[in-house]
Amino acid sequence: MTTQTSAATGSPTQQNNAALADMDSMDRQLLDIIQTGFPLSPRPYAELGQRLGLDEQEVLDRVRGLKARKIIRRLGANFQSAKLGFVSTLCAAKVPQDKMDAFVAEVNAKPGVTHNYLREHDYNIWFTLISPSREETQAILDGITQATGVPILNLPATKLFKIRVDFRMDNDS
């Protein structure tokens, strides 16, 4: 949950900039494509390879390398949960340092948690939760509070303004 930094490794921003600088044009093109147009086919990596002039194994190796370097954190579908009948909420909690690990573990164990962030603020943990109903959301949050002793501020979404972001990696594509 927390980010460790040392003088030897640099700040997280410096680490990210170094990782981006190490990517070649092909990695950048691959990232551009898989963010918005990952093929839904029996052999998606072969299809990506055809678009990029690579073979299937080269694409797989590049994706694995990007994951190993933590440039790709997750590769999977994103669903519009509201269209599937689910509700979402933003949650905040004031978590004392001595309860941090237990609280984070409890939150992260819930399948509906999509993001979980440590912030420098009185409300130092912020996470998003998706569930089938407001009642189930509240039951999940009550369970976390009961298990950890930390109350949670529940801020249900009332209107969606933006749901996606694409990071353009290759200016030539």
Curated annotation (Swiss-Prot):
Substrate binds at residues 115, 119. This is Siroheme decarboxylase alpha subunit. One of its GO terms (molecular function) is lyase activity. Involved in siroheme-dependent heme b biosynthesis. Catalyzes the decarboxylation of siroheme into didecarboxysiroheme. Siroheme is decarboxylated to monodecarboxysiroheme, which is in turn decarboxylated to didecarboxysiroheme. Forms a heterodimer composed of AhbA and AhbB. Pfam families: AsnC_trans_reg2, NirdL-like_HTH. Keywords: Heme biosynthesis, Lyase. Pathway: Porphyrin-containing compound metabolism; protoheme biosynthesis. Gene3D superfamilies: 3.30.70.3460, Winged helix-like DNA-binding domain superfamily/Winged helix DNA-binding domain. Its EC number is 4.1.1.111. GO terms for biological process: heme biosynthetic process. Belongs to the Ahb/Nir family. It comes from Desulfovibrio desulfuricans (strain ATCC 27774 / DSM 6949 / MB). PANTHER family: SIROHEME DECARBOXYLASE NIRL SUBUNIT, TRANSCRIPTIONAL REGULATOR, ASNC FAMILY. It catalyses: siroheme + 2 H(+) = 12,18-didecarboxysiroheme + 2 CO2. The keyword Lyase applies. InterPro entries: AsnC_trans_reg2, HTH-Siroheme_Decarb, NirdL-like_HTH, WH-like_DNA-bd_sf, WH_DNA-bd_sf.
